[in-house]
């Protein structure tokens, strides 16, 4: 199952990355995100690395120590391109005239939740700790922070940002900010 099912979770978040990059650049008054080519390479690396880390879901099935060491290392390497993305989003914000509109709040919420989820992922990448944390709410929190809430926040940010373009109607600013506050 994890051999084909695991790459899916890394591929599912890629459209969210694109939406967050657009929103952060737009509401920072920038033409493009900081380190555009680094962001492209980071997304490609995340997509490819997702195919070689699948067994980190199977540490408890009796793998030998060398195999666990490989998958621990390979899983931790994913932190590098994701760190590049988070750094680039924050660098895009730096020095910009930030417009504190609702899509930007969703994007900042995404960056925060994705970072917290990434930190929990680094801890879970360690096979020794993962065995201790197996079947706990720590694992549930990790994937909800990264994928569930990450994807939801990216989709909501994209929806609020592009809805006026697609429909010709503007969403009420106060109510959308209240909606963000309730969700966060």
Swiss-Prot record:
Residues that hold heme a3 according to the record: 142
Keyword Electron transport: yes
Organism taxonomic ancestry: Eukaryota, Metazoa, Chordata, Craniata, Vertebrata
Pfam family membership, one: COX1
Record protein name field: Cytochrome c oxidase subunit 1
Entry's localization field: Mitochondrion inner membrane
GO molecular function: cytochrome-c oxidase activity; heme binding; metal ion binding
Membrane-side (Mitochondrial matrix) residue stretches: 28-35, 94-101, 167-172
Cofactor(s) required for function per UniProt: heme; Cu cation
InterPro entries membership: Cyt_c_oxase-like_su1_dom, Cyt_c_oxase-like_su1_sf, Cyt_C_Oxase_1, Cyt_c_Oxase_su1_BS
Binding site for Cu cation: 6, 56-57
Residues reported to bind Mg(2+): 134-135
Subunit structure: Component of the cytochrome c oxidase (complex IV, CIV), a multisubunit enzyme composed of 14 subunits. The complex is composed of a catalytic core of 3 subunits MT-CO1, MT-CO2 and MT-CO3, encoded in the mitochondrial DNA, and 11 supernumerary subunits COX4I, COX5A, COX5B, COX6A, COX6B, COX6C, COX7A, COX7B, COX7C, COX8 and NDUFA4, which are encoded in the nuclear genome.
